[in-house]
């Protein structure tokens, strides 16, 4: 009897210990779209209302240009930027459309990794990874520091695809290693934007371009190549996603009209879906069981589909006859630049100023509603089971109630240009604008969260 009681107490303690470790890991925001890489948060504790006069804890000017997302580990915030002598900043959607083609750089940029204190935004250190002149021009709306860094809690890994540089820096700002993986021309001259992810000592890099595409795994300890897989895909801007399903773990890489699942350990192709129409800008969403993904071209909306762990080998996406492993598919429902997100039983997709809600189990569209007076949306969504957050480029964030009915709970405004995907940690919301990094946090004396 005593043994049974002891075992029960031991298991209870073990569960509490594991949960505490899990919650600590989830409290940090170590990569693009958070710890699970899909924008999901267990419970969002940052304020639901903010402005320049409400719940704005601090703002910090950031030199140069960069659409990379900030990442958070403990009290440290990391982000990258590329700085020239003119302190060049990106243009918004309208400005980019008017100018279209960017000018080829005529001078070198400082490619920097910055570390800030999350409490007050003060600068801990700034490290110049390299000073180099990019070989290719980019779209005026893009930057030379659009790829988000990632951390394992000991080092920060950053990737500047425009110059082909990958580097590891410790938490004191010391360069540990750096390697060159090559710089290549991009489709339509837009530039690059695929962020990093890592797992089990491997750093994964997606480099889809118009010359020599590949996905690469580097050893986090020294930057040496573990495996490299050549790809037929042309330019794509989606980021690699680690999908831990009931059968295996896949490194999911979305390319131009294709989605491929690689074995993260070896680089072997586990499965491949073709006929997905065009290049992917958005990254996958997930509910922990399935992944949800899609794309859209500049003139029309592309497919939206769900993939289950039964997917295997190579198959062609066919809406009329779904191949094995495709749970459901819609001909026209894909996202624009903003990655979709799962909240509860629903999948949310943003495209062309509309928010669409789908049943994640069947793909049935529940609603499609216009976001009032919204501008272009590039930043990916984030959500818990009760709220969905979307931020347009003008700094307006819509807080939408999760569920079958479209209901905007709040609209929050900051004055800057925003394309970067936010970061969330321990009641803090970090929003990167073109000019400043903003920290939203409950300020005592504010009545509403």
Question: What kind of feature is each model-predicted range?
Answer:
Residues 8-20:
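Bacterial N-terminal signal peptides
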Residues 1-9:
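Positively charged n-region of N-terminal signal peptides that target proteins for export
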Residues 25-449:
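Noncatalytic, solvent-exposed loop/strand surfaces
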């Amino acid at each position: 009897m005593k043994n049974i009681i002891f075992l029960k107490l031991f298991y209870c303690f073990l569960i509490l210990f594991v949960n505490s470790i899990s919650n600590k890991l989830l409290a940090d925001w170590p990569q693009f779209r958070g710890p699970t890489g899909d924008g999901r948060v267990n419970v969002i504790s940052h304020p639901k209302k903010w402005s320049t006069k409400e719940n704005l804890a601090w703002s910090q000017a950031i030199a140069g240009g960069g659409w990379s997302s900030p990442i958070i580990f403990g009290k440290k915030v990391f982000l990258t930027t590329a700085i020239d002598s003119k302190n060049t900043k990106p243009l918004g959607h309208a400005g980019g459309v008017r100018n279209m083609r960017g000018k080829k750089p005529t001078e070198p940029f400082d490619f920097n990794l910055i570390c800030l204190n999350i409490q007050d935004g003060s600068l801990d250190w700034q490290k110049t990874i390299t000073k180099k002149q990019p070989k290719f021009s980019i779209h005026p709306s893009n930057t030379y520091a659009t790829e988000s860094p990632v951390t394992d809690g000991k080092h920060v890994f950053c990737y500047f695809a425009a110059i082909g540089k990958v580097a590891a820096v410790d938490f004191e700002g010391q360069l540990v290693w750096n390697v060159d993986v090559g710089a290549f021309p991009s489709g339509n001259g837009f530039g690059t934007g695929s962020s990093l992810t890592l797992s089990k000592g491997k750093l994964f890099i997606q480099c889809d371009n118009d010359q020599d595409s590949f996905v690469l795994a580097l050893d986090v300890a020294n930057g040496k190549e573990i495996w490299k897989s050549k790809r037929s895909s042309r330019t794509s801007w989606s980021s690699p996603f680690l999908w831990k399903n009931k059968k295996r773990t896949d490194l999911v890489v979305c390319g131009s009209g294709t989605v491929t699942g690689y074995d993260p350990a070896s680089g072997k192709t586990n499965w491949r879906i073709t006929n997905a129409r065009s290049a992917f800008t958005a990254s996958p969403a997930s509910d922990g069981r399935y992944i949800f993904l899609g794309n859209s071209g500049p003139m029309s909306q592309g497919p939206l589909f769900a993939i289950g762990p039964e997917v295997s080998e190579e198959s062609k996406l066919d809406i009329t006859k779904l191949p094995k492993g495709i749970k459901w598919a819609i001909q026209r429902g894909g996202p624009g630049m903003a990655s979709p997100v799962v909240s509860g039983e629903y999948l949310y997709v943003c495209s062309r100023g509309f928010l669409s809600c789908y049943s994640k189990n069947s793909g049935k569209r529940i609603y499609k509603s216009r976001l009032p007076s919204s501008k272009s949306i590039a930043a990916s969504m984030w959500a818990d089971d009760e709220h969905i957050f979307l931020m347009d480029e003008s700094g307006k964030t819509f807080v939408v109630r999760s569920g079958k009915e479209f209901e905007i709970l709040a609209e929050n405004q900051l004055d800057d240009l925003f394309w970067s995907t936010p970061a969330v940690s321990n009641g803090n919301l970090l929003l990167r604008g073109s000019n400043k990094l903003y920290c939203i946090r409950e300020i005592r004396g504010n009545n509403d969260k």
